[in-house]
Amino acid sequence: MSRLSRVTLALAGLAACGAHGARAQETATWYIPTYSQDIVVWDEASEQVVDRIRMRHPIPNETALNESRDRIYVLEATGQIMEVVDLRTRSVIDEFTLSEGNVSVRIDGFAVHPSDDRALLVVKRYTKGRDRYTVEGPFVLEYDLRAKAVTDTLDWPDGKDRDRGADFRYSPDGRTLYFFADDVIALDADTYEEIDRWQLSKPLEPGLGRPNFSLNPGTYDEPGVSTGLFRMTDPIQNRAMLGIATVRLSDKQADFYTLGPAEPLRGFAVAPGGRKAYSLYSDVGQYEFWEFDLAGRRMVGRHPFAGRPRMGLQVSADGSKLYVFVAGNTIDVYDSATFELLRTVSFDEDMTLGNVVVIPGAATR
């Protein structure tokens, strides 16, 4: 993902000062769904709410940024209505639903094609009768975002439907659709025929247990790369192990290493530049920042802090701060060098448990 570009000053005498000033201006823009009818637009550098995006329906929840980074697709809390937000105007430009009459259709997962002309939806259908509801699905549907019509119903890969945890993703060029199951199955994005398979259900190397990788790219991962924690079982000692893996999905490559026995870590955030990362240790009454040296392939520190029951983690665009958030109406700001709490940023409303979209760069219109 791109970083905020630095301004090159023409005057040589101001070069050092200019470089320092440019670094100080590094920021990112957060789009935070809330338990209201707004998505809050928050600027990292000023730590201020700079705008609000008024949705057509209450409680925006699940969000997804498109490949061009100029639209957010927003699923409201009931899962029945998808709204499309134009980030240039910060306004809702479209919406659709599959519900009609006594039939409610809830979207449990979705992936939008990079062209923004179609999406893949995982849905369930609930039909209200006189004395009962009839539940059907889950189904995988191709939906034309321009014609607002279902254009195809896909067979589940391997013939196994998944009530929970179905995950699809398009490649950046839109030619391949990845389905994440026991294996990673690559489908032609137009014909939906299988063209490749990464058999993660089998050990990557002899004597290793099956790995469980995170395949979701972080804010500061390189394009086409996802770095995250993974867990696997040592088949000889029969113990769970924890490690870090860097996965290049298109090349079916995973560079991984173990750190030690599995621990209750949640959240994993790579810092800008890709040399450091952080995670959160969370046990009853015990919370810690874990600091990782990705270049040295090691954990370099555990730092206790007050913590909170539900936590997400994000690194600032300049790498100097750590943000702890999720649930409630606050973001706790920590120094990434000392791990001391600097301050708590408060909002007028609670944020939902849906994902926050973070885009490096200043908020512009």
Regions found by a protein language model. Give the residues of each.
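Blade-loop segments of beta-propeller domains
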Residues: 52-112
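A short beta-strand motif characteristic of beta-propeller blades
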Residues: 48-54, 91-100, 149-159, 193-208, ...
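Repeated scaffold domains used in trafficking and secretory/extracellular systems
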Residues: 58-66, 103-112, 161-170, 204-221, ...
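Structural motif
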Residues: 38-40, 80-84, 129-141, 183-189, ...
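Short, conserved, GDST-rich strand-edge loop motifs in beta-rich repeat architectures
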Residues: 25, 121-137, 223-239, 281
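Short coil/turn segments that connect the beta-strands within blades of beta-propeller domains
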Residues: 27-29, 68-70, 115-118, 173-175, ...
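Short loop/turn segments that connect beta-strands within beta-propeller blades
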Residues: 44-47, 86-90, 144-148, 189-193, ...
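Blade-level signature of beta-propeller repeat domains, shared across WD40, Kelch, NHL, RCC1
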Residues: 325-365
